[in-house]
């Protein structure tokens, strides 16, 4: 009986920890990156609109793709681990897009286009792997465990 209690405590710590990490990452992505783009890349809301649209497509594709794969493979923890790690890496790398403009809003059209493209691509990759780890992996695993 005591062994089952220990397993239950570990399980709930894992559920709480992974859930917290996932929500913190989504919060950082959704709250901070829009203001980052506006402050460091360009004061142009069109870039943010493109970011939102492309990342919505990326997350939808990732959820269907990795959700199906994890259903067929039955190893959701692998998708959670790989997805969360890559999500974290691309979240960190997103900040490097600031270097394209030197930390100031873009001054020329070519620099602006390069920076805007880099931001949209970085956000799409970050959202893709976030969806792999959190939506297709963690949420499905949690549902299986309940």
Label each residue range with its predicted role.
Residues 48-70, 84-90, 94:
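Central cavity-lining transmembrane alpha-helices of secondary-active solute carriers
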Residues 20, 24, 57, 61, ...:
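Hydrophobic/aromatic residues within the transmembrane alpha-helices of Major Facilitator Superfamily
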